[in-house]
């Protein structure tokens, strides 16, 4: 599915499953807490996969996805 493809790309872009501490979401964003935020890819890379943008605030990042975020989160968590 599109959601599973996006989830697998996002995991690579944030430095792999081992770099993800926590995952939540709001209405439109996948919110992640990372161990090391220095290894994540650039916002353009997230946009190339289909994200609308990236909010990077230290170890807390938000991938702006849109209303399909619950299905992307589900696939993302399955890959952790």
Predicted feature residues:
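Structured cytosolic domains appended to multi-pass membrane proteins
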Residues: 2-80
